[in-house]
Amino acid sequence: MEGALDTNRKNAIEIKGLGKKYESFNDGESQYVLRDINIDVMENEFVCVLGPSGCGKSTLLNLISGYIKPSDGEIDIFGEKVTKASGRAGMVFQEHALMPWLTVKKNIMMGPKLHHKSKEECEKIAKKYIDMVGLGGIEDYYPRQLSGGMAQRVGIARALANEPKIILMDEPLGALDAMTRENMRRELLNIFQKTQITIFFITHSVQEAVYLADRVIVLKNAAVDCDVKIEMDRPRDMKSPDFAKYIE
């Protein structure tokens, strides 16, 4: 699996002059949590966003999804301005947020049902993504019966079942133990390769970002501090000298 991108691909996400400010509870003055953000994400590109807590990573994701509105600038998804939450991008959170009264299969079928797919289509879509994330055999389990890694796989399958062109991920592996997290990274890259989807991934781990991404964007003091292209083929060895250069 190569890390090179086709430069003829169009932009999936265009962020232009983006700013978000909130009114301070203390003095009533507005304070920017994001300022003058300019980012282009290509179709079928895996981009990781890094930064300390409170730097605006999750706010940026919520702006791209349309859950909140910007104070300045705009965001386009495949050339269309984001004005509200529309379902054009799938979302995966640190907490899987599965419906506890629904089985794995029925959680995954929720999106297709909302898009008025037939029962047969919903079943077919659910099976496709259950198999893709390696959950065959547990489709009738309930969320309480799943490990953290399994539950997060269901969350990813549920997002994919809507068949979006973009997946937005807010530290989806952050709550997992080290071994499960390592396995999930490999699974995620496998899904990325199979689906040719665009992934915009928030993390606080430098190693994780370098392992996964085509590009790593670092946020600091409410702005883009740097944008680094990872010029390494996949799969990547975290112990290699080339990998260490990016960590330094």
Region roles according to the model:
Residues S65:
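Helix-to-loop junction immediately C-terminal to a conserved catalytic motif
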Residues M109, E120-G137, N190:
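Conserved ABC ATPase "signature" region
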Residues I167-D170:
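Catalytic Walker B motif of ABC-type/P-loop ATPase nucleotide-binding domains
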Residues L102-M110:
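Short coil-to-helix segment of the ABC ATPase nucleotide-binding domain corresponding to the Q-loop/switch region
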Residues L50-P52:
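The feature captures the beta-strand-to-loop junction immediately N-terminal to the Walker
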Residues I156:
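Hydrophobic anchor residue at the start of the ABC signature
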Residues Y141-R144, N162:
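Conserved signature/switch motifs of ABC ATPase nucleotide-binding domains
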Residues G73-A85:
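Conserved ABC transporter NBD signature motif
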